[in-house]
Amino acid sequence: MNPPDERFDIVDRDDRVVGSGLRSEIHARGLLHRAVHLWLFHEDGRILLQKRSLSKDREPGRWTSSVSGHVNSGEEYDTAMKREIPEEIGIPTATCQGLGRIKYFPACDATDQEFVWLYRATHSGPFQPDPSEVAGLEWFTPTQIDQMLVHQPGDFSSCLKMLWKQRPR
């Protein structure tokens, strides 16, 4: 779940740490901070998307990346990614084949003022999602995601829409 007393680093426009603050304060004041997203690919090319828990404080019930989360205060992006994978979808990080960074996104309104590193890996499951974090997991082809974004854009988180539009091809 997302306790309001989680502590995150506050960063400047160049993604340099300038302080730290509580999650609730950072979000309320729109301060710049950091996050990670992972797109998990099945061996057949489908992408696993996560439906955010209805108890989330930001964009509940919307489809987003396979895994996503904040970088805690004093933590590096890669460490946060490795922590979030077992927390959210219940698999050991070591079982994700080819885990690596694919693109960096600057903070903006669509990312909720988060600098984001997008990662990718391959894993075909099974998964054990944490119900306090994840309402569901589903595999989609890239074509299905493209079509859903046209016909059902409100079903997706703002961040996923932006990441998908600007994804490496």
Residues covered by each model-derived region:
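Acidic, metal-coordinating catalytic segment for phosphate/diphosphate chemistry
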Residues: 2-37, 43
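Short, well-ordered strand-loop elements centered on a beta-strand within folded domains, enriched
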Residues: 17-21, 45-51, 126-130
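A short, polar/proline- and glycine-enriched secondary-structure boundary/capping micro-motif
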Residues: 29-31, 58-63, 140-141
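A glycine-rich, hydrophobic loop/mini-helix early in the fold
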Residues: 35-67
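The catalytic Nudix box helix
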Residues: 48-49, 66-99
